[in-house]
Each structure stands twice: as structure tokens, then as C-alpha cells.
């Protein structure tokens, strides 16, 4: 596969000023993280898998090349914050549904989705650069990795809340078939709102 804008990613890595690498569930997140970890060691967030053997396999795969994977918990968030302060590269999926109390309801495809605000918080606290990375196919199913810089609105309190979901929408819309719609993005509905997946 080809990599679009790899020069941008290498340039930001080489500055050694910390870097927030944002993925989402387009094609294979694990394949993408494997590629990222081949470019530079990272500290990444992951959601623990109930099957302990599969969990161990996935975690070990994500910890190659001196990378570290930490669970999506308060403790894990502290670790990636410290990694950023130490000018390391962090990576996680920004469309991952957070635990209750660790996110907010933000519009995603014009529907309230329980969303992480971790990207916005880390960016504002550290002023580290933020980039999106995602896998995409073309009409011949040839895969590419796309890398895009996040807007400076990520550092603006009046704009950053809606930014991540809006940007992810735009990238999904480039080729909607690539998004993992089976990943239940709206599974944590607000009180009184019907679960959209119950009839699926």
C-alpha cells in the first residue's frame, strides 16, 4: 500500500516535541497501529478484550518496537499524558466509545454519540501537534494510509469540542464502505433514547 503525507508524520516525529496520533475505525486499526509502531515507538490506548488469550495476543502485537499499550482508564490516561509531556508519540482511536464519566454527547452524523474529549484535552494542555491517520481503499480495493494535520481549532476552547467528530465524518465520507459501521458508535444512548442497535 502507499502512504500519503508520510513526510509530514516523519517531520513531526523528528521534532521530538510530543505528537498526538489519532486513528478511527476505518479498515483495520490494528494494521494501522502496526505501521505506526514501525515508524516510531508509541504509547497507545486500547480497550481490554474479554478473552484473555486474544487480549494478550493483541496487546503483545501493539507493543512491538518498544511501544507500550495501556488500558482506557484513568490510569491509562495519566500514562499517555505523561508520555506526551516527555515528548513521546501517543496513539489511539478517537471514535472509541469511552467509559461512562469519561466523555460527552457530541453530534456524529447529526445524532448524539457518547464521545471522547481526550484529544481536545491533551492538545490544549500540552500544545502538542495532532495528526489523523487512517486506512482507505480505492475502487480497486488498493489500500493506502492517509495522514492529515488537524486544524489549529483543536487548541481553541470555543471550537475544539465539535472538531474531532466533524473531521472524522469528513474522512469517512471519502469512502463510507471502509468504515467499520458494525462498531456500535451509538451504543451508549442518552436516557430516554431508544438503542438503535436493538432491532438490527
Residue ranges and their predicted role:
Residues 1-19, 27:
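A short, well-structured juxtamembrane/interface segment
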Residues 10-16, 38-39, 43, 75-200:
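Non-catalytic C-terminal accessory region of glycerolipid acyltransferases
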Residues 17-74, 100-107, 111:
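Catalytic core of membrane glycerolipid acyltransferases/transacylases, capturing the structured
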Amino acid at each position: 500500500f502507499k502512504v500519503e503525507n508520510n513526510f509530514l508524520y516523519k517531520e513531526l516525529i523528528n521534532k521530538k516535541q510530543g505528537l498526538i496520533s489519532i486513528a478511527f475505525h476505518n479498515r483495520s486499526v490494528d494494521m494501522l497501529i502496526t505501521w505506526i509502531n514501525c515508524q516510531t515507538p508509541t504509547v497507545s490506548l486500547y480497550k481490554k478484550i474479554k478473552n484473555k488469550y486474544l487480549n494478550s495476543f493483541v496487546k503483545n502485537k501493539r507493543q512491538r518496537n518498544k511501544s507500550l499499550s495501556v488500558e482506557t482508564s484513568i490510569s491509562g490516561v495519566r500514562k499517555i499524558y505523561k508520555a506526551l509531556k516527555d515528548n513521546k508519540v501517543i496513539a489511539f482511536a478517537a471514535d472509541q466509545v469511552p467509559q461512562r464519566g469519561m466523555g460527552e454527547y457530541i453530534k456524529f452524523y447529526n445524532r448524539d454519540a457518547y464521545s471522547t474529549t481526550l484529544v481536545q484535552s491533551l492538545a490544549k494542555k500540552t500544545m502538542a501537534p495532532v495528526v489523523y491517520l487512517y486506512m482507505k481503499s480505492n475502487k480497486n480495493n488498493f489500500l493506502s494510509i492517509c495522514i492529515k494535520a488537524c486544524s489549529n481549532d483543536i487548541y481553541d476552547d470555543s471550537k475544539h469540542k465539535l472538531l474531532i467528530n466533524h473531521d472524522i465524518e469528513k474522512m469517512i465520507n471519502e469512502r463510507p464502505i471502509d468504515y467499520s459501521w458494525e462498531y456500535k458508535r451509538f451504543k451508549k444512548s442518552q436516557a430516554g433514547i431508544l438503542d438503535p442497535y436493538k432491532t438490527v
